[in-house]
């Protein structure tokens, strides 16, 4: 990828010296997206309970890096997010991601980086895989409304991962499936995460450099830690997620974490999502000097 600043985004360059795959273009931040989204909330361990990541919580192509960083789950509120981006700089696409909660990474003999991280993520667009500092995998998404004439109809969502090294063949079995049931009693209400005090909800995501593992799906290795603050605003409604896989599971525990979430989640019928330019960090979690920044 180019290490020269983009004409449309002066001063911004991508956090890698590797070439972008042929046929794709760099889509530099900021990204402003219109979407529909569902948030499923994993259980939050109490202070005296063990802090253990569920099976399938870490991307297998990044596991060696996670081991090197001694990645540790330390608790706190996480999310499973299903998102249908109607507009984006790389076109419409779907996304499934998992944020376990707070993670701690040992970045040096006397340094750590701690905070929220996306550790599993699937998208339906190779262009989205290419443009990100997150371990994205390609997948096919199915969303089915039970009653097209009912605006509060439950939706069945299933995600089928791409076969290894393929961008056109997908597993016949889903790694995640759920029935999403909007509340009929509780009306929509406005929510802007930017207005929520950080001591209640710190939305910053801390993402490690990506392994260039030769997966064949367009993922490009990166070289810098970065942090980004995603901004959500729009109308929200309470919803109730139900498992659709065998044995009452949401995720299969291999391709996606097997968690039993809270019985109540959030549905964003219309959401405005903003991804501002990330801040590149040193091993102490501090922003690098302006002249050394590489953002994506």
What feature does the model see in each segment?
Residues 16, 20, 72, 76, ...:
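Alpha-helical context
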Residues 45-118, 124-133:
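Short N-terminal edge-element motif at the start of the domain
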């Amino acid at each position: 990828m180019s290490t020269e600043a983009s004409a449309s985004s002066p001063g911004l360059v991508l956090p890698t010296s590797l070439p972008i795959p042929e046929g794709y273009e760099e889509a530099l931040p900021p990204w402003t997206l219109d979407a529909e989204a569902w948030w499923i909330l994993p259980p939050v361990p109490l202070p005296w309970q063990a802090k253990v990541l569920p099976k399938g919580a870490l991307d297998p192509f990044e596991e060696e890096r996670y081991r090197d960083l001694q990645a540790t789950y330390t608790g706190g509120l996480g999310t499973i997010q299903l998102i249908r981006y109607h507009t984006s700089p790389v076109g419409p696409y779907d996304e499934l991601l998992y944020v376990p909660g707070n993670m701690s990474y040992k970045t040096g003999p006397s340094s750590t980086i701690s905070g929220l991280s996306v550790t599993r993520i699937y998208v339906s667009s190779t262009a989205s895989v290419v443009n990100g500092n997150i371990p994205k995998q390609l997948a096919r998404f199915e969303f089915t409304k039970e009653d097209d004439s009912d605006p509060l109809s439950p939706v069945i969502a299933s995600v089928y991962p791409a076969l290894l090294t393929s961008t056109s063949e997908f597993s016949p079995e889903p790694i995640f499936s759920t029935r999403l049931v909007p509340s009929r009693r509780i009306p929509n209400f406005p929510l802007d995460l930017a207005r929520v005090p950080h001591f209640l909800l710190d939305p910053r995501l801390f993402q490690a450099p990506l392994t260039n593992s030769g997966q064949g799906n367009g993922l490009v290795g990166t070289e810098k830690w970065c942090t980004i603050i995603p901004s959500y605003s729009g109308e929200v409604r309470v919803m109730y997620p139900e498992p659709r896989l065998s044995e009452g599971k949401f995720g299969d525990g291999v391709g996606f974490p097997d968690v039993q979430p809270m019985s109540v989640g959030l549905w964003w019928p219309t959401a405005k999502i903003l991804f501002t330019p990330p801040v590149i960090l040193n091993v102490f979690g501090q922003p690098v000097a302006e002249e050394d920044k590489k953002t994506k």
